[in-house]
Structures are given as C-alpha cells and as structure tokens.
Amino acid sequence: MRERLRPAVERDWPEIAAVLQRHGLPLDGAADHLADFVVAESDEGICGVAGLEVHGEAALLRSVAVVAPGDGLGTRLVTHVITQAEARGIRDLVLLTTTAGAFFPRFGFTAVSRDDVPAALRTSAEFQGACPASALVMRRTSRHAELP
C-alpha cells in the first residue's frame, strides 16, 4: 500500500518523535513547528516525516526521516514540503545535515557556509546547538531549482 501524506497533528507527536530519535535527529524546536510538518502514514502508523520551521520569508527544512529508506518516500516527502513552501511564498530553504548531504542536491540544495544563511534562520534551535557545528549547511532558492 502506498503511504498517504497528510499534515501532522498534535496527536502525531509521540510517533514523530520516535521516528526522529531512531534516526538521531534533534527534537529541539520541532514540536513548536508541528503545524508545518507533514507525515507519511501507512496502515501500521507514521512511517515518515518532514517539516518546515518558518522564519519570515525563509524556512528551515528539518526533521526529514523515513522508517524504511529506499522506496522513494523521502523524495516524496521533501518534494511535498518544498511545494508547500513555494505555495506560501517561501523561496529560501536551508537545512542542516550530518548524514544526508548526498540526498539533497537533487532538490536544488547546495552546500553553503553558515554565514550565507538568512539571519532569521540562525536563531532556530537547530542552528543554536540542536545540530552539531560540524553539520553540513545546504541552501535552496526556488528561482534556481527544479524538483525531481
């Protein structure tokens, strides 16, 4: 059965937190932005998640995780969240990753320095220590990128 994507709701938080923890992703600040998260749901429950942390006209793409990688669900989730961001007029997306630097270029993300990140995003929990300083910073501006 193909997973159904839907907006996250408050009652999803325990399952979302479990998926994120299983992948070693930070929980700091995630619950505060749950209204901008999407989950993938199968008959067994939540099997994937991706979220936005919106700060003005820019957003942090965060908390991208799937229970069983390799079936394209991660691509579906990221594409969905990017499309939602663009529909809201958000054209500048940034992410931090320690493990998935090879996954995100297909969506138009390129490596940048922390200094290239909009100031509003540098105040997020992820930039303030939830992600290690060694994390790769990637940025996507929609006017320069096509989705897979």
Predicted regions and their residues:
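A generic "binding-loop/recognition-motif" signal
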Residues: 12, 57, 99-100
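Short amphipathic alpha-helix that is part of the acyltransferase structural core
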Residues: 1-29, 41, 135-137, 141-148
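A short, internal acetyl-CoA/4′-phosphopantetheine-binding micro-motif in the GNAT/acyltransferase core
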Residues: 64-72, 99
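Conserved acetyl-CoA-binding loop-helix of GNAT-fold acetyltransferases
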Residues: 71-85, 95
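Conserved beta-strand in the GNAT
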Residues: 39, 44-54, 58-65
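Conserved active-site alpha-helix within GNAT-family acetyltransferase domains
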Residues: 98-128
